[in-house]
Amino acid sequence: MLHRAQSLLAHYFGYEKFRSGQDEAIRLVTEARQNTACIMPTGGGKSICYQIPALMFEGTTIVISPLISLMKDQVDALEEAGINAAYINSTQSNQEIYERLNGLKEGAYKLFYITPERLTSIEFIRILQGIDVPLVAIDEAHCISQWGHDFRPSYRNIEILFRELHDKPVIMALTATATPEVHDDICKQLHIQKENTVYTGFSRENLTFKVVKGENKDRFIDEYVQNNRHEAGIVYTATRKEADRIYERLKRNQVRAGRYHGGLADDVRKEQQERFLNDELQVMVATSAFGMGIDKSNIRFVLHAQIPKDMESYYQEAGRAGRDGLASECVLLFSPQDIMVQRFLIEQSEHEEKQKQDLKKLRQMVDYCHTEDCLQRFILMYFGEKEPDACGQCGNCTDTRAAHDVTREAQMVLSCIIRMKERFGKTMVAQVLAGSKNKKVLENGFSDLSTYGILKHQSVGEISDFIEFLISDDFIRMSDGTFPTLFVSSKGRNVLKGELSVARKEALKAAAITENDELFERLRMVRKEIAAEQGVPPFVVFSDQTLKEMSGKQPVNDDELLSIKGVGEQKRAKYGRLFLQEIQAYARMTD
């Protein structure tokens, strides 16, 4: 049976062998007919685990997903590969839904995608009772657990299937973010024996994780986006206001930027999302509302401009980078005042127990920002992996920046804060240290302080950056409230007493992630033109990974093209000639 599965994989998807865990998951549902849980990292190929069995079984596989935007992309990709599939959701007209339900009754589809809310429809359950449903795949299965970071009560509707379908289908639950408690809950809710779990770990070896502390965020984002101007990326923020601010800044810098958050109209969000998927926008600035169901495989970087609320959210959002397996970066820009933003959002909850749980998770997120250990290892241990190895490539593992003693400068700043009675914010303190003639500085008599102008060889901006560094290393703390004031921590007072020294590493450079060759860029243009004609996102035609391999191997005929990962029979027949022509034209030009 596995031989047939491999043959289908090559024919439809263009891959010669399964990735880790895929063959075991397929065996459990097709041969053993066991309800199965798949815990695999984002980009680990979870969808193949149910798409191949769907092709092997008679009847229609039902796929339950909360991600409306993902449904269309996945169905487009399946149809591009020559597989009959459809979806229904709330974005469609009654006529469209009626036609697709008729197709479902007639057995026209191998896979049929729905949201969990659809299971409350008596009419829909009756249709399922009248057709052959061999397999039900439940994507984003962590949504069924009250212990998960994204619990959705609608997922409890899945219980209806167990009650109402006489011929019990095999259940497959899939997730990329499940702590041990969430895993237990998934198995309990979906009648899965824990030993029937395919677990390939959470490690994403193609992702490089970094935490940037004590740096000017705006400058870092500007330089990073400029250095990676040919790559797609997402900048996440905790609030709509910050998303709007960064978006406007990038637009002023001539960046092809979009924005996405709950304060925008539905049609605006949809238009921005489609432009990003179609490579018309380089960068999307967004709150956590964006990304659930984004199957764009060539996102090369994810920057978090503010700390997320918990590790599950962070890993899920960061994990949208590099889904095609190519090298990508996930950078978290840490600033202590961002903790207060998340605390405020958490404290809006009326449930005391949930508040306590969420504050504990936020504390773990802050620990991640301060750890000097391997960042990938910290994440894996959070998700329950025992003694994972250091990744050797994250910002902490590869940090060779020289550290300079800045104790004297730190004492100047700390002394100034105390002399200002610890009643003012960062900008005012920086202005006093720089010797500013600002009206407020003079009115408050700060020009008479011994620390006035003591750092006049630096700009107010440079001093503000240095204060940010002292805050991030807990020498200075900030009060709560809309206009936070600075006060010296006990650690900072030890510096003033001469009992503790302060060392600062050189600023982290915003470097380019990868260098792309000319042929790869030409193949990307061919792909973009085809995608525009077909009305699908470019990655649905071929992934960046497939184009990279084409660029490296430069196939000259159909057989050689079929040996490239991601080129199946259908796509070879449909697009092969255009890509081979471009490769041949490039070869002639460079001879």
UniProtKB/Swiss-Prot annotation:
It comes from the Bacteria. The keyword Signal does not apply. SMART domains: DEXDc, HELICc, HRDC, RQC. ATP binds at M40, P41, T42, G43, G44, G45, K46, S47. It is found in: Cytoplasm, Nucleoid. Residues 513-591 form the HRDC domain. GO terms for molecular function: 3'-5' DNA helicase activity; ATP binding; ATP hydrolysis activity; DNA binding; four-way junction helicase activity; metal ion binding. It holds the Pfam family DEAD. Disruption phenotype: Cells lacking this gene are moderately sensitive to DNA-damaging agents. Sensitivity increases in the presence of mutated AddAB nuclease. Keywords: ATP-binding, Cytoplasm, DNA damage, DNA recombination, DNA repair, DNA-binding, Helicase, Hydrolase, Isomerase, Metal-binding, Nucleotide-binding, SOS response, Zinc. Optimal helicase activity requires 0.8-1.2 Mg(2+) per ATP molecule. GO terms for cellular component: bacterial nucleoid; chromosome; cytoplasm; replisome. Residues 27-196 form the Helicase ATP-binding domain. SUPFAM superfamilies: HRDC-like, P-loop containing nucleoside triphosphate hydrolases, Winged helix' DNA-binding domain. Its cofactor is Mg(2+); Zn(2+). An ATP-dependent DNA helicase which unwinds DNA in a 3'-5' direction. Requires between 2 and 5 single-stranded nucleotides on the 3'-end to initiate unwinding, is not active on blunt-ended DNA. Can target DNA replication, repair, and recombination intermediates; is active on forked, gapped and 3'-overhang DNA as well as 5'-flaps, Kappa joints, synthetic replication forks, and Holliday junctions. Prefers ATP over dATP, is not active with other nucleotides. Only unwinds short partial duplexes in vitro; SsbA enhances its activity on longer substrates. This is ATP-dependent DNA helicase RecQ. It comes from Bacillus subtilis (strain 168). The gene is recQ.
